[in-house]
């Protein structure tokens, strides 16, 4: 993996902007890599820099996480429910990812698949936004085991590049009666164990291949994605509260269509 500094920074920005938006960070990294002609073999880079964006969640919600940890020490029911719901939501992707992720990636990790998934995902968001009414849950602590597990199952769809992990989990949560902002925040929290697991696995598999240049590229991309994600998360919650998810659906459809035309015409 040999990338220019400009490519590393741009990919870090793409990751930081798209990780928590329902637009597929992995899909955008694949398409951006195609446009910038990034060399093959950057999969570990793409996965590990996502952890930079995840760290932004930990920092922004540090007081809430500290309260949960303190509550667990006191056996506080709300803290226990919060932790339980995040872990239950993580379980399906941990199991299915360990078994099937490699095969799915080998078959579907192409720019064409990303473009089609962006379009179909955008249409799905518009449909769900129209159908969902009257949420019954307005907190992560208030989610049932069934809801948490259901969102976790839907998250497995995001193993298909272009689907979007945040998009799948947020739409799954909305469909199961979770309020918009809570659905977005649950998606943020669910990303922590999910991406920690994916990053650990990626680093373990690449442990004999990472040299100084690769490690430096990953470190730069990590820092850039962290800084950008810090700025994007609060903006995203404000947009969702005021306008819902339709703006992101239309973006997906337009971006996916443009990418598909470009890929087929070149």
Swiss-Prot record:
Keywords attached to this entry: Antibiotic resistance, Cell inner membrane, Cell membrane, Cell shape, Cell wall biogenesis/degradation, Hydrolase, Membrane, Peptidoglycan synthesis, Transmembrane, Transmembrane helix
Protein name as catalogued: Undecaprenyl-diphosphatase
Keyword check for Chaperone: no
Xref: NCBIfam families: PRK00281.1-2, PRK00281.1-4, undec_PP_bacA
Main location (coarse class): membrane
Family to which the UniProt record says this protein belongs: Belongs to the UppP family.
HAMAP family for the chain: Undec_diphosphatase
Organism: Rhizorhabdus wittichii (strain DSM 6014 / CCUG 31198 / JCM 15750 / NBRC 105917 / EY 4224 / RW1)
Catalytic activity: di-trans,octa-cis-undecaprenyl diphosphate + H2O = di-trans,octa-cis-undecaprenyl phosphate + phosphate + H(+)
Gene assigned in the entry: uppP
Subcellular location: Cell inner membrane
Transmembrane segments: 3-23, 41-61, 86-106, 108-128, 149-171, 184-204, 220-240, 245-265
Protein EC: 3.6.1.27
GO biological process terms held by the UniProt record: cell wall organization; peptidoglycan biosynthetic process; regulation of cell shape; response to antibiotic
Membrane topology according to the record: Multi-pass membrane protein
């Amino acid at each position: 993996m040999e990338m220019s500094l400009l490519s590393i920074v741009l990919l870090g920005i793409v990751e930081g902007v798209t990780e928590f938006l329902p637009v597929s960070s992995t899909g955008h990294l694949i398409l951006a890599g195609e446009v910038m002609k990034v060399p093959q073999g950057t999969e570990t880079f793409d996965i590990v820099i996502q952890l930079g964006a995840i760290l932004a969640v930990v920092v922004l919600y540090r007081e809430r996480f500290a309260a949960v940890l303190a509550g667990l020490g006191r056996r506080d029911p709300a803290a226990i429910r919060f932790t339980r719901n995040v872990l239950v939501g993580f379980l399906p992707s941990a199991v299915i990812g360990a078994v099937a992720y490699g095969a799915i990636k080998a078959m579907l990790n192409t720019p064409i698949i990303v473009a089609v998934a962006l379009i179909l995902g955008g249409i799905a968001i518009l449909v769900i936004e129209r159908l969902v009414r009257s949420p019954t849950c307005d907190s992560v602590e208030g989610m049932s085991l069934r809801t948490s597990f259901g969102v976790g199952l839907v998250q497995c769809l995001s193993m298909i590049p272009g689907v979007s992990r945040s998009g799948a989990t947020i739409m799954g949560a909305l469909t199961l009666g979770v309020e918009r902002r809570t659905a977005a925040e649950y998606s943020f929290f669910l990303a922590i164990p999910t991406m920690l697991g994916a990053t650990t696995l990626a680093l373990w598999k690449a442990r004999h291949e990472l040299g100084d240049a690769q490690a430096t590229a990953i470190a730069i991309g990590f820092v850039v994605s962290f800084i950008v994600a810090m700025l994007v998360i609060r903006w995203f919650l404000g947009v969702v509260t005021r306008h819902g998810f339709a703006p992101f659906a239309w973006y997906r459809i337009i971006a996916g269509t443009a990418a598909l035309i470009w890929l087929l015409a070149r």
